[in-house]
């Protein structure tokens, strides 16, 4: 198989059917999603059997238990995957929505219409449920999609795609609307991210090395985030009960997610009061702490934090703690070491909260709330394709609207420009 020719063929077919999807109605798209969900439930045993092939191959390659868990499809996870497609079907269709329509002095009406991006390439690792989630979101937003999953989930992804294709067929939509790359050759990634004539945007979901490679080599716009180095700053005017609850939840609810806190900043004026309490909570949760010299003075049992720690997304029960003079130093630290993902201030001071919201340059900035809320579902977007820390085109959780663009529309009645 010539990989370049194969990928060009996928791109060409995707571009062709993207025009069909752009004019498809919400009823057709929703029917396809509902039918795909039904086929996923109906074929659950076939999905489990395909997944067993991937798990056996993974074990033979020595994949660790965490990776194997992300790879595993159970009956319960398959049911959640099907329900996810139904939830996407229940969301409002963004395509065709007109906004900001107004009359101009010339008499014309000018507004903006939401339209699909066209063809989306999604490159991801391990989790086979991404195949269904990504296909569903792209379909509902009127986009054709080319999915390149991780080689470790090859059989699972193909089986899920088969169910989605059946759903598309039942709804009278082309199966090429969702194409899964049928090769594990790594050259396929390079061929996909350089197809500027066929593919409009690339969305990578995976580890830092994958995203860095795609960012450097792609000839197509990329929607991405590299790291989730999220901060919680406890101000000296914070409610201590709120501060403890937020800082514990932000770190301990789930470790291996991009919106978990990785660095805790504490105002010097309240550090002696709150850090011993925080230390007890983290110790009981099994979180390893690393701190600046001042923090070590209050928590002598912890390890020293290095310069590298401030730049690290742990995705593990590890936390770096730094005592800062106040809000200015906290913002300076976040600006220098942060990844523009999610930051929170805990304070009862309205002016300081407004300053934090205004001056911190991240995709989500919060007041008195856990960083774990940085999520499309929690924001009312429904499902999300990922979180973007870029400033163009989408920023923060990327849901259906983030997979569309806008074009200007002008309505006249024989108007000519004088």
Curated annotation (Swiss-Prot):
Q: Which Pfam families match?
A: Aldedh
Q: What is its EC number?
A: 1.2.1.41
Q: State a GO cellular component annotated for this protein.
A: cytoplasm
GO MF, one example: NADP binding
* Known catalytic reactions: L-glutamate 5-semialdehyde + phosphate + NADP(+) = L-glutamyl 5-phosphate + NADPH + H(+)
What does the record list as GO biological process? L-proline biosynthetic process
Subcellular localization(s) per the UniProt record: Cytoplasm
Q: Which UniProt keywords apply?
A: Amino-acid biosynthesis, Cytoplasm, NADP, Oxidoreductase, Proline biosynthesis
Could you say which enzyme class this protein belongs to? oxidoreductase
Annotated pathway = Amino-acid biosynthesis; L-proline biosynthesis; L-glutamate 5-semialdehyde from L-glutamate: step 2/2
Show the Gene3D superfamilies listed in the entry: Aldehyde Dehydrogenase, Chain A, domain 1, Aldehyde Dehydrogenase, Chain A, domain 2
Lineage top rank: taxon: Bacteria
The record ties this protein, via PANTHER family, to: DELTA-1-PYRROLINE-5-CARBOXYLATE SYNTHASE (PTHR11063:SF8), GLUTAMATE SEMIALDEHYDE DEHYDROGENASE (PTHR11063)
For this chain, the family text in UniProt reads: Belongs to the gamma-glutamyl phosphate reductase family.
**Briefly, what is this protein's role?**
Catalyzes the NADPH-dependent reduction of L-glutamate 5-phosphate into L-glutamate 5-semialdehyde and phosphate. The product spontaneously undergoes cyclization to form 1-pyrroline-5-carboxylate.
Q: What is this protein called?
A: Gamma-glutamyl phosphate reductase
Read off the lineage from the record: Bacteria, Pseudomonadati, Pseudomonadota, Gammaproteobacteria, Chromatiales
- Gene that specifies this protein: proA
């Amino acid at each position: 198989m010539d990989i370049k020719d194969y990928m060009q063929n996928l791109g060409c077919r995707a571009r062709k059917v993207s025009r069909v999807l752009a004019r498809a109605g919400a009823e057709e798209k929703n029917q396809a999603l509902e039918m795909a969900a039904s086929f996923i439930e109906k074929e659950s045993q076939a999905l489990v059997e395909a997944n067993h092939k991937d798990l056996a191959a993974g074990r033979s390659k020595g994949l660790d238990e965490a990776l194997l868990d992300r790879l595993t499809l159970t009956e319960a996870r398959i049911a959640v995957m099907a329900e996810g497609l139904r939830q996407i079907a229940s969301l409002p269709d963004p395509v065709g929505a007109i906004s900001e329509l107004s009359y101009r002095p010339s008499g014309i009406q000018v507004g903006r219409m939401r339209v699909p991006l066209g063809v989306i390439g999604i490159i991801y690792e391990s989790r086979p449920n991404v195949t269904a989630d990504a296909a569903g979101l792209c379909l509902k937003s009127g986009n054709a999609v080319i999915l390149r999953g991780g080689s470790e989930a090859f059989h699972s992804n193909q089986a899920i795609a088969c169910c989605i294709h059946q759903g598309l067929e039942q709804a009278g939509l082309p199966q090429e609307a969702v194409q899964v790359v049928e090769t594990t050759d790594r050259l396929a990634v390079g061929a996909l991210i350089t197809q500027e004539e066929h593919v409009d945007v690339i969305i990578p979901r995976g580890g830092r090395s994958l995203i860095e490679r795609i960012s450097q080599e792609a000839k197509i716009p990329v929607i991405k985030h590299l790291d989730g180095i999220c901060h919680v700053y406890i101000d000296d005017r914070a409610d201590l009960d709120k501060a403890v609850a937020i800082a514990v939840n932000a770190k301990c609810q789930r470790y291996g997610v991009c919106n978990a806190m990785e660095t805790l900043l504490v105002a010097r004026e309240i550090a002696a009061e709150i850090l011993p309490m925080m230390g007890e909570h983290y110790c009981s949760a099994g979180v390893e702490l690393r701190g600046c010299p001042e923090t070590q003075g209050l928590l002598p049992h912890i390890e020293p934090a290095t310069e590298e720690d401030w730049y690290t997304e742990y995705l593990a029960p590890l936390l770096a703690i730094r005592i800062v003079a106040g809000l200015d130093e906290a913002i300076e630290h976040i600006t220098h070491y942060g990844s523009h993902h999610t930051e929170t201030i805990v304070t009862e001071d309205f002016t300081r909260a407004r300053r934090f919201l205004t001056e911190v340059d991240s995709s989500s900035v919060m007041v008195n709330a856990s960083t774990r809320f940085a999520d499309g579902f929690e924001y009312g977007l429904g499902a999300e394709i990922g979180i973007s820390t870029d400033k163009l085109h989408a920023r923060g959780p990327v849901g259906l609207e983030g997979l569309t663009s806008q074009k200007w529309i002008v309505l006249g009645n024989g108007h000519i420009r004088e």
